[in-house]
Amino acid sequence: MNINATILGQAIAFVLFVMFCMKFVWPPIMAAIEKRQKEIADGLSSAERAKKDLDLAQANATDQMKKAKVEAQVIIEQANKQKAQILDDAKAEAEQERNRIVTQAQAEIDAERKRAREELRKQVAMLAIAGAEKIIERSVDEAANSDIVDKLVAEL
């Protein structure tokens, strides 16, 4: 193998070219590659953070839904209790009103009964007086007296 000046010149040119590339071309390429690697790593970590945030948000949403369901159930139970209380109060009020009306009606019936008895007593007294007057008018005849008394008893 012959080593001549051309090969030696090419080797020196190649070494100079490699040194030039290592000094001026390679650092910007490496910087661009490192920058791209950093951007990819940042993107991956950002995606991982976003996934964790999403999982956390889903967990929070699930917890809030559970809490909302519990609160809704509590509100429904309170509404049912309030409804039952209102119904009980209305029933009690209606019962009191019924008792008041019955008591008032009973008092009116008693008053009417007393008035009717008093009226009946007055009529009986008037009939007794009328009967006594008739007996006195016909006091001579004993058979007529017993007949008048029988009629009075029949009228009473």
Curated annotation (Swiss-Prot):
Pfam hit, one: ATP-synt_B
Compartments (UniProt record): Cell inner membrane
UniProt name for this protein: ATP synthase subunit b
UniProt keyword list: ATP synthesis, Cell inner membrane, Cell membrane, CF(0), Hydrogen ion transport, Ion transport, Membrane, Transmembrane, Transmembrane helix, Transport
The protein's role, per its UniProt record: F(1)F(0) ATP synthase produces ATP from ADP in the presence of a proton or sodium gradient. F-type ATPases consist of two structural domains, F(1) containing the extramembraneous catalytic core and F(0) containing the membrane proton channel, linked together by a central stalk and a peripheral stalk. During catalysis, ATP synthesis in the catalytic domain of F(1) is coupled via a rotary mechanism of the central stalk subunits to proton translocation. Component of the F(0) channel, it forms part of the peripheral stalk, linking F(1) to F(0).
Alphabetical list of InterPro entries matching this protein: ATP_synth_B-like_membr_sf, ATP_synth_b/b'su_bac/chlpt, ATP_synth_F0_bsu_bac, ATP_synthase_B_chain
Domain of life: Bacteria
Subunit architecture: F-type ATPases have 2 components, F(1) - the catalytic core - and F(0) - the membrane proton channel. F(1) has five subunits: alpha(3), beta(3), gamma(1), delta(1), epsilon(1). F(0) has three main subunits: a(1), b(2) and c(10-14). The alpha and beta chains form an alternating ring which encloses part of the gamma chain. F(1) is attached to F(0) by a central stalk formed by the gamma and epsilon chains, while a peripheral stalk is formed by the delta and b chains.
Transmembrane regions: 11-31
GO terms under cellular component: plasma membrane; proton-transporting ATP synthase complex
GO molecular function: proton-transporting ATP synthase activity, rotational mechanism; proton-transporting ATPase activity, rotational mechanism
Source species taxonomy: Bacteria, Pseudomonadati, Pseudomonadota, Gammaproteobacteria, Enterobacterales
Similarity comment: family membership: Belongs to the ATPase B chain family.
Membrane topology term: Single-pass membrane protein
Main location: membrane
